[in-house]
């Protein structure tokens, strides 16, 4: 048994992954690290060294003074660890450390191989300390687990148990300013570590931005670093009740820290931007900044409720900016796909607004961090409590300014042994569309649509990739002949467009039944982003019959984007909700999207998140409902200013009782929707049934105007029956 007291060795604990950064910080404070273990550094120094770490360490979790080691004389499998801990506690005279009138608490940690009921063992340590006091002075101290004057930290080991005085009291990450919390906040010392790793102070930024600020931790920690504010300046510590506490030394260190902070406040600070889509987070950030003592600096901090889609012009040209944020990863957002879309959208915004600037972004999975467009990226893995996180550091790559594919395409002479007519027609179509696509920035369009009877296929351009759909040939056509002709067409497509085979995706399109639109054709899941107007949209050219973006409704979506500002928008049979997305980006007061397919609603949410819009948020600005549209219209009462309905021609989904036929059922569908339309609102109705006729009852009840020609773009002029569309309003508006 060894009861020697060593007052010149200290343990400094930290979160896993911070050991290197913490060692650098401690050595900058003038203290040498003598030993390094996982989550713990050991230093040799004076009490002043320990106090300085308490005052100035932004990264440490605790500062522990080992005061008693209880060496085990023998160990065996049946050992009673709780009783060993009691024996170790009672064998030391604790009245040498603190007075019996002080309150205390026990924090017990057992090494991995030690099997012990920590709750019971903690009680036995408490009993040992109390019994030691009774033997020494005849009085016992009281337990206070919430605000003890003394905290004892006990490490249960394999060959010895170590009893420490916790000089920090509460964990050092508790700076005392966090009065208001948000979901899944990052600990203060981890936030500081990220800022230290990113060399915030050395970069001397003119702009500091946290676009998803939560409770404001990054902003406050950045303020503390840039104003030389000691993290321990205003918090309570665990040494005030310790007999060995040097009050004069501590007060002198405190005065020194206060003086340094006041001097640093005389220097100019960057402009801070703290944004969040949640008003509660914005409020929490403001209150926490005030609680941290930075109320006088609020004029330098723009704290606003903003989504990523609502960023202002930062005027960041020729300025040094620093971006740091903790996006709502994991359970706070939902599935992994939506998380990936969030990081893709954030990356695009950074590239546009802050090219060549430094950023540090937290991710829950490394795959999320990998989509960030950073030069020379570095990754730091940390533990935020029990959650592993990955921090990606790097310089933001400049945005790649792209033009529509046709803007750079040039017609070249193409000679084909066969399929020359097809090649000529495709080239003619592309030449005719080139000027329009370039002027209007059209990235996705139809290039060919069964123009020639012998080549019964559709060729669609999505960005710089082609989606080729072969219409199933009639039974009277020899399958081998049809296959040969299709292969000839593919060769002509490659020759005319200049695209290689990897950029061409092929499907065979048969007549749709009520469910096969939703049936997976493949499991490749090769989704990518295309641009349409202001919207970035995820498309999939492999997995489903449809791609996620109906090209023939482009003009309708752009029309909705122009008309949606300030309006409440309803999208029925919303598919991937691209019309809702355009409405949202066009400034709609709210969007509501209804579709029977959970698959497509999940895709819809990814589209919204990709564009910096919040989904499933408390303010219910953008809502998604997996429901039969007939029943949904019947059950609700909310009114909408703008409604878009694009129903299928026919549906017999298992989720839908009965069948839907657009010709048979459009009257009751439109009437139900008109009951949800405001008196001055507009409903757009469209469908792809070639034989569709609007019922006279609808024309008699409402103001009805067919606008088909206005909703078909130049790329579909060759197929005027691709869809039909109407504008419907309540009577008396025109």
UniProtKB/Swiss-Prot annotation:
Its main location: cytoplasm. One of its GO terms (molecular function) is RNA binding. It catalyses: guanosine(2445) in 23S rRNA + S-adenosyl-L-methionine = N(2)-methylguanosine(2445) in 23S rRNA + S-adenosyl-L-homocysteine + H(+); guanosine(2069) in 23S rRNA + S-adenosyl-L-methionine = N(2)-methylguanosine(2069) in 23S rRNA + S-adenosyl-L-homocysteine + H(+). One of its GO terms (cellular component) is cytoplasm. Its EC number is 2.1.1.173, 2.1.1.264. It is found in: Cytoplasm. CDD domains: AdoMet_MTases, THUMP_AdoMetMT. Residues 49-167 form the THUMP domain. NCBIfam families: PRK11783.1 (NF008748). This is Ribosomal RNA large subunit methyltransferase K/L. It comes from Acinetobacter baumannii (strain ACICU). The lineage of its organism: Bacteria, Pseudomonadati, Pseudomonadota, Gammaproteobacteria, Moraxellales.
């Amino acid at each position: 048994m060894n009861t020697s007291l060593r007052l010149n060795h200290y343990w400094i604990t930290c979160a896993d992954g911070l050991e290197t950064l913490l060692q650098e910080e401690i050595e900058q404070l003038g203290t040498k690290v003598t030993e390094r273990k996982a989550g713990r550094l050991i230093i040799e120094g004076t009490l002043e060294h320990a106090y300085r770490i308490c005052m100035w360490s932004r990264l440490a979790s605790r500062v522990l003074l080992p005061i008693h080691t209880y060496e085990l004389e023998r160990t065996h499998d049946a050992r009673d660890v709780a009783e060993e801990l009691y024996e170790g506690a009672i064998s030391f005279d604790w009245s040498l450390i603190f007075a019996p009138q002080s309150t205390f608490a026990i924090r017990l940690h057992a090494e991995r191989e030690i099997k012990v009921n920590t709750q019971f063992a903690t009680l036995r340590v408490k009993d040992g300390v109390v019994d030691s006091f009774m033997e020494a002075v005849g009085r016992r101290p009281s337990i206070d687990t919430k605000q003890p004057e003394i905290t004892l930290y006990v490490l249960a080991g394999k060959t010895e148990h170590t009893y420490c005085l916790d000089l920090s009291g509460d964990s050092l990450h508790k700076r005392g300013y966090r009065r208001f919390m948000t979901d899944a906040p990052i600990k203060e010392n981890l936030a500081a570590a990220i800022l230290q790793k990113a060399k915030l102070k050395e970069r001397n930024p003119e702009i500091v931005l946290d676009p998803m600020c939560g409770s404001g931790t990054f902003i406050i920690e950045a303020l503390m670093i840039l104003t030389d504010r000691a993290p321990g300046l205003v918090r309570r510590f665990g040494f005030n009740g310790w007999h060995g506490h040097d009050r004069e030394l501590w007060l002198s260190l405190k005065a020194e820290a206060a003086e340094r902070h006041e001097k640093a406040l005389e220097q100019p600070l960057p402009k801070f931007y703290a944004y969040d889509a949640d008003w509660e987070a914005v409020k929490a950030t403001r209150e926490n900044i005030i609680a941290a003592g930075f109320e006088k600096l609020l004029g330098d901090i723009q704290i606003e409720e903003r989504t990523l889609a609502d960023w202002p012009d930062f005027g960041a040209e020729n300025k040094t900016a620093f971006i740091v944020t903790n996006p709502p990863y994991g359970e706070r957002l939902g599935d992994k796909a939506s998380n990936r879309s969030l990081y893709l959208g954030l990356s695009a915004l950074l590239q546009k607004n802050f090219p060549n600037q430094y950023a540090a972004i937290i991710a829950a999975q490394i795959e999320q961090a990998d989509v960030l467009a950073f030069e020379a990226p570095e990754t730091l893995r940390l533990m935020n409590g029990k959650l592993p996180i990955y921090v990606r550091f790097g310089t933001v790559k400049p945005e790649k300014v792209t033009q529509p594919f046709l803007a750079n395409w040039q017609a070249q002479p193409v000679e084909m042994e066969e399929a020359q007519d097809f090649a000529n027609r495709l080239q003619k179509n592309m030449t005719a569309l080139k000027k329009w696509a370039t002027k209007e920035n059209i990235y996705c369009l139809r290039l060919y649509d069964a123009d020639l009877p012998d080549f019964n296929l559709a060729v669609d351009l999505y960005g710089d990739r082609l989606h080729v759909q072969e219409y199933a040939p009639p039974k009277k056509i020899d399958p081998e002949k049809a296959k040969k002709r299709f292969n000839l067409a593919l060769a002509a497509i490659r020759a005319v467009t200049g695209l290689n085979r990897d950029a061409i995706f092929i499907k065979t399109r048969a007549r749709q039944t009520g469910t096969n639109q939703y049936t997976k054709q493949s499991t490749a899941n090769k989704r990518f982003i295309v641009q349409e107007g202001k919207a970035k949209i995820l498309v999939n050219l492999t997995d489903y019959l449809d791609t996620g973006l109906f090209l023939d409704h482009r003009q309708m979506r752009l029309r909705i984007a122009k008309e949606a500002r300030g309006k409440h928008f309803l999208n029925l049979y919303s598919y991937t909700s691209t019309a809702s997305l355009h409405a949202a980006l066009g400034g709609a007061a709210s969007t509501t999207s209804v579709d029977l397919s959970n698959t497509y609603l999940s895709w819809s949410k990814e589209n919204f998140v990709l564009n910096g819009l919040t989904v499933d948020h408390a303010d219910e600005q953008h809502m998604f409902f997996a429901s039969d549209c007939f029943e949904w219209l019947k059950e609700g009462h909310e009114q909408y200013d703008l409604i878009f309905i694009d129903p299928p021609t026919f549906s017999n989904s298992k989720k839908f009782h009965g069948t839907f036929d657009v010709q048979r059922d459009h009257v009751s569908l439109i009437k139900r929707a008109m009951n949800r339309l405001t008196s001055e609102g507009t409903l757009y109705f469209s469908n792809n049934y070639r034989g569709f006729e609007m019922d006279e009852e609808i024309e008699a009840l409402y103001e009805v105007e067919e606008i088909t020609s206005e909703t078909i773009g130049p790329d579909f002029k060759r197929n005027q029956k691709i869809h039909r569309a109407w504008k419907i309003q309540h009577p008396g508006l025109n």
